[in-house]
UniProtKB/Swiss-Prot annotation:
UniProt keyword Ubl conjugation, yes or no: yes
Subcellular location: Cytoplasm, Cytosol; Mitochondrion; Nucleus
Database matches in Pfam families: PRY (PF13765), SPRY (PF00622), zf-B_box (PF00643), zf-C3HC4_4 (PF15227)
Family listed: Belongs to the TRIM/RBCC family.
Name of the protein: E3 ubiquitin-protein ligase TRIM39
Subunit structure: Interacts with MOAP1. Interacts with CDKN1A.
Pathway named in the protein's UniProt entry: Protein modification; protein ubiquitination
Zinc finger annotations (RING-type) as residue ranges: 29-70
E.C. numbers: 2.3.2.27
Gene Ontology molecular function terms on file: identical protein binding; ubiquitin protein ligase activity; zinc ion binding
Coiled coil region boundaries: 181-250
């Protein structure tokens, strides 16, 4: 059977060689017997090298015969045969390949075709080698059979390679899409930032207009009081000047003349001690003059009256600005959410503080708690009493030196009773710490977070309409991670204090008011 295969292989090779030889003949010039160079075709249809047929007809002026069929043509007609020229080049290449294959497929020892394959020596051998002493006891099969066998083995090796190639191709395709996705995400975040600051500018402009209007009103009020006070002081000045002139005139009169018109000087500036000397000046009219002096002394206030002035000190809101612009601070304070813990949702191993601001894990399960639909019975966490369906909200959680915790939000419809994996796909958006130093955003798969400064307090900012949940390290004022999603349900702040490991991680999670907003 092996000999039959060898004969069939030899017949196939002979047929191929004959076809190649025929092609070489057709691509050869009948004059020079070499491959055609610049082949041209004459009237009878035969092809020759342009140089060969030109030399053949060199001394002829008419009746140009064909070197092959002797048919004559009346004109020296030479048409280039470019298609044949291309075939000649192909024939040359095939001849080179044939020569190489022939050299490689011949036994270097016996110069016979290498038509068999020796399994023991893993090499191709000729028929003479197969029956020689060297390979006589070896397993020898036709080369085509061995080729097919090894081709199947290589095919099996190729399958995992192709699978890996497809995987890498998919990965490459995915990576090539990421710049576009990144561009879209960046543009979305850019538009969000622009909207945020546009809104911030609008609110600041409104606050600025309110404050400027208030400042202008206060300015006008103070100016009005200044004008009124100036007019009043002008009137007082004129009265005092007139009185001073009259007093000076009276001082120049004799005592009798001065006392004669004393009733007209009730508004004059007469010292109180003057009353004690009246008895010596005019003893007869002493009693009457005492009454007049009382009237005069009542007008002494003209001398002692203090002149009032209008203060131009502005209100404290305008004279002392706080460290942050209070208008901006006022806007930001509106975002702070008053978050308290809901005992109806707390896992039985969690204990809440009296003010419902702290939660910690205890080893002993509380048995007197009713198993309500809202209570978590597998995942040891607790939710807030208030959820959010719109708007922007910010709260802070003190994590201290805990080694295990998670904070974030969950949607209203999450499973609370059975075993679960808290991921965005199941309705949980969280950042967590475990083993004391491993931080991650609980995406699919987890996104490791490389945090330089260990946070003692974590800030959480929810923008429901924008579909973002951002986490911040309050300790060093750095951004930790932002989830981007589409929120369609009520979202509840979530707190997971982590299980205790001996004395480690015993501290509670505590909701704290932001301390840098005042």
């Amino acid at each position: 059977m092996a000999e039959t295969s060898l004969l069939e292989a030899g017949a196939s090779a002979a047929s191929t060689a004959a076809a190649l030889e025929n092609l070489q003949v057709e691509a050869s010039c009948s004059v020079c017997l070499e491959y055609l160079k610049e082949p041209v075709i004459i009237e009878c249809g035969h092809n020759f090298c342009k140089a060969c047929i030109t030399r053949w007809w060199e001394d002829l002026e008419r009746d140009f015969p064909c070197p092959v069929c002797r048919k004559t043509s009346r004109y020296r007609s030479l048409r280039p045969n470019r298609q044949l020229g291309s075939m000649v080049e192909i024939a040359k290449q095939l001849q080179a390949v044939k020569r190489k294959i022939r050299d490689e497929s011949l036994c270097p020892q016996h110069h016979e075709a290498l038509s068999l394959f020796c399994y023991e020596d893993q090499e191709a051998v000729c028929l003479i080698c197969a029956i020689s002493h060297t390979h006589r006891a070896h397993t020898v099969v036709p080369l085509d059979d061995a080729t097919q066998e090894y081709k199947e083995k290589l095919q099996k090796c190729l399958e995992p390679l192709e699978q890996k190639l497809q995987e890498i191709t998919r990965c490459k395709s995915s990576e090539e899409k990421k710049p576009g996705e990144l561009k879209r995400l960046v543009e979305s975040r850019r538009q969000q930032i622009l909207r945020e600051f546009e809104e911030l500018h609008r609110r600041l402009d409104e606050e600025q207009q309110v404050l400027l209007s208030r400042l202008e009103e206060e300015e006008q009020d103070i100016l009005q009081r200044l004008r009124e006070n100036a007019a009043h002081l002008g009137d007082k000045r004129r009265d005092l000047a007139h009185l001073a002139a009259e007093v000076e005139g009276k001082c120049l009169q004799s005592g009798f003349e001065m006392l004669k018109d004393v009733k007209s000087t009730l508004e004059k500036n007469i010292p109180r001690k003057f009353g004690g000397s009246l008895s010596r000046i005019c003893p007869r009219d002493h009693k009457a003059l005492l009454g007049l002096v009382k009237e005069i002394n009542r007008c002494e206030k003209v001398k002692t009256m203090e002149v009032t002035s209008v203060s131009i000190e502005l209100e404290k809101n305008f004279s002392n600005f706080p460290r942050q612009y209070f208008a901006l601070r006022k806007i930001l304070k509106q975002l702070i959410a008053d978050v308290t813990l809901d005992p109806e949702t707390a896992h039985p191993n969690l204990v809440l503080s009296e003010d419902r601001k702290s939660v910690k894990f205890v080893e002993t399960r509380l048995r007197d708690l009713p198993d309500t639909p809202r209570r978590f019975t597998f995942y040891p966490c607790v939710l807030a009493t208030e959820g959010f369906t719109s708007g922007r909200h910010y709260w802070e959680v003190e994590v201290g030196d805990k080694t295990h915790w998670a904070v974030g939000v969950c949607r209203d419809s999450v499973s609370r009773k059975g075993e679960l994996t808290p991921l965005p796909e199941t309705g949980y958006w969280r950042v967590r710490l475990w083993n004391g130093d491993k931080y991650a955003a609980t995406t699919t798969p987890f996104t490791p977070l490389h945090i330089k400064v260990k946070p003692k307090r974590v800030g959480i900012f929810l923008d429901y309409e924008a579909g973002t949940l951002s986490f911040y390290n309050v300790t060093d004022r750095s951004h930790i991670y932002t989830f981007t999603d589409t929120f369609t349900e009520k979202l509840w702040p979530l707190f997971y204090p982590g299980i205790r490991a001996g004395r480690k991680n015993a501290a509670p999670l505590t909701i704290r008011p932001p301390t840098d907003w005042e």
